[in-house]
Structures are given as structure tokens and as C-alpha cells.
């Protein structure tokens, strides 16, 4: 899963264009593709520096039979009622952070059309910060090696990778990388566009919640994914290069034409 998530993050900052085709429930006009490829993606802000020591910050996943483990399994069982429903469909549309549906929903939360064509400084900041989350996420996943719920408690999941016996490609469950990156970006973009902080944080929380609806994560995976995102955010806040990029993103978003989406 870390390879899949990394590819999506890099695509956000280095693709020639990020389409803005929203899902039917969130119509957003399409962005015009850039005519030429964008410059090479810079590395993360922590490149060449020790990554976040996530094992000192993240609690171990619930012990089998504990109250949290029971709650996780109950939530997974209950989520079967949502198969095929609105959250299930939204989770499918937003399987990748670089997907058009994900970017359209994030744009609506920020109140500006996000793409390399329209907000390049913001997109590079978002992508670089996402790269910095991959290393600690991978360390935690490999250390705890928690199975995905659909591999232990069975049942359908919304990610097609979970089918046809290739579910192992999704990797381990704990913590949720999608939840972590969604919350990291929510914290960063709340600083870059403070007038939209409430909507942005709602989107960030929803990124993790959709992974439960997708039935690829336990509740505690998602909760502690947010802890991962917050830990990376706190570390980045001390980096001068990140602060400089944040200043550029603030100015860029303040000058961007407002984007109003249906409520």
C-alpha cells in the first residue's frame, strides 16, 4: 500500500495536469490540462533528515479481545450495511489521493480549484508533505503488521485490489495511510486557507472515515492514522523550507478565484 500511496502523492505534484472532474454530487468545472509536463517533483521537506520516529508516538494496535478490538470488529460488521451506499461509492471514487474525485472534494473544502495549473505552490507543498508521511507510515505498518479486516473477518471491501486473492497488495492495516495523509493535508491547508479551516478539517476527517466505509480499515487504524498525520505536521512546522512554501501557498490561495460548490 505504501508504494500505491507514494505513487499517488508524487503524481499530485509532478503530473502534467490534475483533472478536476467532480463526482455527480459535487460538480466542479474541469481544469484545463497543462500543455507541457511540470518540472520534476522536489523531495520531501525531511529529505536527508531523520524521519518522524513514529514508533515512539503511536500506540500499538488493539490487543485481540480488548475493548477496542471488540469495537473495531463491531464497526466492521456494521459497515456491511453500507455496501453499495453513498459513502461506499464516495470511497471508491476517492481510492487514490490523486483521483479527480478526491481533488474535486478537496478543492471544494479549500474554496479554490487546486491543480498544478491554478495553484502550483499549494500543490507542490501538499505533495512534498505527503512524501514525508510515507516513511513513518511504512515503518509502523511493517512493525505492527496488522491484518486488514477483510482478510480476518471476511466480507466485501470497496477497493478492487482486495478481490481475486490479491488483497495482500494493500499491505498492512495499521495505521491508515489515507487517514494520515488526509489529516496531514487538512492541518496544512487549514493554515494556508484559515477562512476555510472548518470545511478543510471536515474533509480531512472524512478521508479516514471513508476507509472504514470502504471496509479496508479498522476504526483504530483510522484514528491513529490521524495521529500519524499530526506528528508529521508538527515536525514539518519546524522546517524553514516548509514555512517558506506555506507562505507562498497562503498568498496563492488568497489570490485564487473563489470556488463555490453545492452544499
What are these regions (language model features)?
Residues 1-7:
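Sec-dependent signal peptide recognition
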Residues 2, 178, 217:
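Histidine-centered active-site/metal-ligand motif
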Residues 14-15:
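N-terminal signal peptide c-region/cleavage motif recognized by signal peptidases
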Residues 23-213:
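Hydrophobic alpha-helical bundle signature of multipass membrane enzymes
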Residues 206-237, 244:
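Interfacial helix-loop-helix junctions of multi-pass membrane proteins
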Residues 232-263:
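C-terminal membrane module of polytopic membrane proteins
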Amino acid at each position: 500500500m505504501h508504494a500505491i500511496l507514494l505513487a499517488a502523492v508524487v503524481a499530485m505534484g509532478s503530473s502534467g495536469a490534475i483533472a478536476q472532474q467532480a463526482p455527480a454530487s459535487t460538480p466542479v468545472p474541469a481544469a484545463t490540462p497543462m500543455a507541457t509536463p511540470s518540472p520534476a517533483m522536489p523531495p520531501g521537506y525531511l529529505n536527508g533528515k531523520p524521519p518522524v520516529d513514529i514508533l515512539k508516538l503511536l500506540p500499538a494496535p488493539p490487543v485481540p479481545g480488548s475493548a477496542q478490538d471488540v469495537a473495531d470488529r463491531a464497526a466492521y460488521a456494521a459497515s456491511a450495511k453500507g455496501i453499495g451506499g453513498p459513502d461506499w461509492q464516495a470511497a471508491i471514487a476517492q481510492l487514490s489521493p490523486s483521483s479527480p474525485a478526491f481533488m474535486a472534494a478537496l478543492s471544494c473544502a479549500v474554496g479554490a480549484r487546486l491543480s498544478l495549473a491554478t495553484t502550483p505552490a499549494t500543490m507542490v507543498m501538499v505533495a512534498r508533505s505527503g512524501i514525508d508521511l510515507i516513511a513513518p507510515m511504512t515503518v509502523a505498518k511493517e512493525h505492527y503488521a496488522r491484518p486488514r479486516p477483510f482478510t480476518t473477518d471476511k466480507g466485501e471491501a470497496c477497493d478492487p485490489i482486495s478481490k481475486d486473492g490479491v488483497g495482500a497488495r494493500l499491505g498492512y492495516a495499521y495505521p491508515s495511510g489515507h487517514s494520515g495523509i488526509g489529516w496531514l493535508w487538512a492541518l496544512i491547508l487549514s493554515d494556508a486557507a484559515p477562512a476555510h479551516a472548518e470545511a478543510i478539517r471536515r474533509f480531512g476527517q472524512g478521508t479516514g472515515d471513508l476507509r472504514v466505509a470502504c471496509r479496508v480499515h479498522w476504526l483504530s487504524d483510522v484514528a491513529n492514522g490521524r495521529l500519524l498525520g499530526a506528528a508529521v505536521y508538527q515536525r514539518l512546522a519546524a522546517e524553514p523550507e516548509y514555512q517558506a512554501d506555506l507562505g507562498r501557498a497562503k498568498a496563492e490561495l488568497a489570490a485564487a478565484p473563489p470556488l463555490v460548490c453545492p452544499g
